């Protein structure tokens, strides 16, 4: 019998959720996703030190010798995310997701500006917009930024998505893809209820993605649904048939080593009709979010966590820049 991973790949686009190039080589996904935490983890591996140096050197050359170190580090942060993305694109046939600075999550204009800058860096290296997804947090401001960017042919992946109303707002904005989280929703419910576990069919994260998928397909939305943030392979198999699923190397390995029959659970051709289309303006969106304690808390936690990862990455880049430029100064 084929592995779960092989069977899943025949009904769902499998995406690698990692910045580790070796893991991507191993599992041959179509697409890959990164985020600040994953880039930070990869940047701390000795194997990728050369990519950090490349980002810093390119940024210094771009800004000139008179530029302040803080400005070089800021530029290098964008450069590093794109450098990793370009390396990943050498290994996959599809798209890479590169995230906008999470600290801009409540600033529409700054998010648009940053996204344009990121895509321009890819374009400068001959990479077309079709191979890049710009990841943006699913705040109202982020969704509005994505709406503008999509009209400029800059494709967006709306992340940190924890409830149905965030998904609806994204679909109405015409975004290319959403990443509804599964495991982080489960974490919240386990903590809130004191339950140790949920059967996969009752897992609140699985239930959330299933509802979003069926709503999109039954109402003709073109926005792709990519389940994300998994805690176990049971969550993944319960969403077999979803447009895409982005999966960590650890869980990809478990799927690859497990051999059992995998039935399709979500079917785009035969979606369950849940409810009619609804329209959300900013007021109704914010009311729906305010009424959902889990989504509000997890969105805030996610933005905070990614922002802290960016701060750490900037510190790492700053230390490395001082070391490199200190060594250069000593040789002159």
Curated annotation (Swiss-Prot):
Keyword Acetylation tagged: no
Catalytic machinery residues: 135
Pfam families linked to this entry: TAL_FSA
Localization annotation: Cytoplasm
EC number, UniProt record: 2.2.1.2
HAMAP family: Transaldolase_1
Family to which the UniProt record says this protein belongs: Belongs to the transaldolase family. Type 1 subfamily.
Annotated function: Transaldolase is important for the balance of metabolites in the pentose-phosphate pathway.
Protein name per its UniProtKB record: Transaldolase
Gene: tal
């Amino acid at each position: 019998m084929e592995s779960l991973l092989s069977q899943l790949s025949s009904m769902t686009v499998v995406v690698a959720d990692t910045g580790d190039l070796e893991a991507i080589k191993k599992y041959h996904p179509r697409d890959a996703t990164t985020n600040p935490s994953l880039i930070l983890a990869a940047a701390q591996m000795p194997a990728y030190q050369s990519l950090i140096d490349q980002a810093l050197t390119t940024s210094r050359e771009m800004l000139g010798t008179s530029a302040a170190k803080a400005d070089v580090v800021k530029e290098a942060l964008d450069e590093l995310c794109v450098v990793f993305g370009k390396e990943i694109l050498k290994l996959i046939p599809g798209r890479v997701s590169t995230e906008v600075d999470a600290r801009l999550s409540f600033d529409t204009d700054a998010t648009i500006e940053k996204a344009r800058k990121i895509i321009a860096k890819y374009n400068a290296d001959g990479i077309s917009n079709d191979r890049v997804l710009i990841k943006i947090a699913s705040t109202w401001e982020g969704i509005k930024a994505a709406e503008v960017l999509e009209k400029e042919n800059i494709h967006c992946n709306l992340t940190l998505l924890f409830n149905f109303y965030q998904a609806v707002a994204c679909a109405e904005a015409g975004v290319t893809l959403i990443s509804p989280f599964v495991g982080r929703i489960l974490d919240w419910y386990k903590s809130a209820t004191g339950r140790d576990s949920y059967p996969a069919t009752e897992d609140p994260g699985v239930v959330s993605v299933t509802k979003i998928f069926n709503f999109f397909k039954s109402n003709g939305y073109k926005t792709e649904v990519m389940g994300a943030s998994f805690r176990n392979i049971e969550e993944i198999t319960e969403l077999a048939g979803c447009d895409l699923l982005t999966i960590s190397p650890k869980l990809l390995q478990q799927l690859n080593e497990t051999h059992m029959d995998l039935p399709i659970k979500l079917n785009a051709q035969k979606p369950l009709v849940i409810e009619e289309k609804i329209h959300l303006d900013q007021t109704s969106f914010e009311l729906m979010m305010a009424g959902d304690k889990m989504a509000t808390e997890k969105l805030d936690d996610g933005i905070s966590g990614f922002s802290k990862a960016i701060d750490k990455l900037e510190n790492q880049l700053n230390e490395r820049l001082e070391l490199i430029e200190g060594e250069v100064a000593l040789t002159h």
